[in-house]
Curated annotation (Swiss-Prot):
Keywords: Chloroplast, Membrane, Photosynthesis, Photosystem II, Plastid, Thylakoid, Transit peptide. The lineage of its organism: Eukaryota, Viridiplantae, Streptophyta, Embryophyta, Tracheophyta. Associated with the oxygen-evolving complex of photosystem II. It is found in: Plastid, Chloroplast thylakoid membrane. GO terms for cellular component: chloroplast thylakoid membrane; photosystem II oxygen evolving complex. InterPro entries: PSII_PsbR. Belongs to the psbR family. It comes from Spinacia oleracea. This is Photosystem II 10 kDa polypeptide, chloroplastic. The keyword Disulfide bond does not apply.
């Protein structure tokens, strides 16, 4: 049945056509022009470097001090030692000396902690070995 339907249809050129010569009002022409297109710079813009920006140059400070009441030092950013009096770790340490163990002879986790650590390590090693075995030719 499909072949009879397809054979009864004949593909004819459509009577609907677009006349490329006539232009429609209000629409731009789609034809390409043969004129070449060039880009030219308008001129060279010089950067002024005689007076630098920042605290040493372009920043206007009221009464000669910044918002924290300090006079400018000529640097654009604060230095941690000058601003805080110490390195950042002096005020926000990542460790606390009171939490340290008095000696390193005894593990703080005890026997249970060591057993959990050993089982985790053995599981990771066994899992890795199983992955290597399953992806190798030995598993075939």
């Amino acid at each position: 049945m499909a072949t009879s339907v397809m054979s009864s249809l004949s593909l004819k050129p459509s009577s609907f056509g677009v006349d490329t010569k006539s232009a429609v009002k209000g629409l731009p022409s789609l034809s390409r022009s043969s004129a070449s297109f060039t880009v030219r710079a308008s001129g060279v813009k010089k950067i002024k470097v005689d007076k630098p920006l920042g605290i040493g140059g372009g920043m206007k400070l009221r009464d000669g001090v910044d918002s924290s009441g300090r006079k400018p030092t000529g640097k654009g950013v604060y230095q941690f030692v000058d601003k805080y009096g110490a390195n950042v770790d002096g005020y926000s340490p990542i460790y606390n000396e009171e939490e340290w163990a008095p000696t390193g002879d005894v593990y703080a986790g005890g026997t249970t902690g060591l057993l959990i650590w050993a089982v985790t390590l053995a599981g990771l090693l066994a899992g890795g070995a199983l992955l290597v075995y399953n992806t190798s030719a030995l598993a075939q």
